[in-house]
Amino acid sequence: MKTPFGKTPGQRSRADAGHAGVSANMMKKRTSHKKHRTSVGPSKPVSQPRRNIVGCRIQHGWREGNGPVTQWKGTVLDQVPVNPSLYLIKYDGFDCVYGLELNKDERVSALEVLPDRVATSRISDAHLADTMIGKAVEHMFETEDGSKDEWRGMVLARAPVMNTWFYITYEKDPVLYMYQLLDDYKEGDLRIMPDSNDSPPAEREPGEVVDSLVGKQVEYAKEDGSKRTGMVIHQVEAKPSVYFIKFDDDFHIYVYDLVKTS
């Protein structure tokens, strides 16, 4: 299976997902997305103390099969409580959030924690930031010919660590993305849809236990009859029926409404 490493944003293989792929020209044309990756040799590995690396900048080598080693830099967003080996990472120049077992995956080499800190910024409009969480949106992307293409999706949450970024997913491509949506809103590239007729979630009493699928193993039947397995790793607070799933054969984080009825 093709991996996201070494691919440009939006060119990730979706053959095993059962969904149409996102073409590269649908991604935001920002300078960070125009970086070119070159093959490099592994850097000197650091010692193995298992420090908490959430919030840290990292770099590591990646080698798929007999291919060359490529170097990757990114920010560690989270360590998954139900699978502490699994980290969520935002790589520089890429829009997807990736899930990797950094200390176990044999394709990862020379993992280093970098000295540079993640810059923190003040949210320019806290009320707007809170308002868009859990909302359906229309997000405009610039295509190669300069025209606009509209993607409907849902804003899921403020991203951890990178505090001016938001988690979002799309109907056309239900994986976890990150964008600075306040900027897009102010530029006219993001529109919050009117509230639907869906009833709001019921208020819960303090201390009330709510059933959750987090930590459960899941099985997904593909169109060709084969199956893929994975784990539910997160429940979206703003939409409790929506969950993040990490499949065993993929690095992307999938976003599904697991309680939706037809």
UniProtKB/Swiss-Prot annotation:
One of its GO terms (cellular component) is chromatin. InterPro entries: SPIN/Ssty, SPIN/Ssty_sf. Pfam families: Spin-Ssty. Phosphorylated during oocyte meiotic maturation. The keyword Ubl conjugation applies. Oocyte, egg, and very early embryo; not in the 8-, and 16-cell stage of the embryo. Isoform 1: Present in testis. Isoform 1 is more highly expressed in adult testes compared with newborn testes (at protein level). Disruption phenotype: Early postnatal lethality. Ovarian folliculogenesis and oocyte growth appear normal but fully grown oocytes show defects in resuming meiosis. Gene3D superfamilies: Spindlin/Ssty. Residues 27-38 have a biased composition (Basic residues). Residues 132-193 are annotated as: Tudor-like domain 2. Keywords: Acetylation, Cell cycle, Chromatin regulator, Cytoplasm, Cytoskeleton, Developmental protein, DNA-binding, Isopeptide bond, Meiosis, Nucleus, Phosphoprotein, Repeat, Ubl conjugation, Wnt signaling pathway. Residues 93-98, 142, 250-252 are annotated as: Histone H3K4me3 and H3R8me2a binding. The keyword Ligase does not apply. Residues 53-116 are annotated as: Tudor-like domain 1. The 3 tudor-like domains (also named Spin/Ssty repeats) specifically recognize and bind methylated histones. H3K4me3 and H3R8me2a are recognized by tudor-like domains 2 and 1, respectively. Homodimer; may form higher-order oligomers. Interacts with TCF7L2/TCF4; the interaction is direct. Interacts with HABP4 and SERBP1. Interacts with SPINDOC; SPINDOC stabilizes SPIN1 and enhances its association with bivalent H3K4me3K9me3 mark. Interacts with SPOCD1; promoting recruitment of PIWIL4 and SPOCD1 to transposons. Belongs to the SPIN/STSY family. This is Spindlin-1. It comes from Mus musculus. The gene is Spin1.
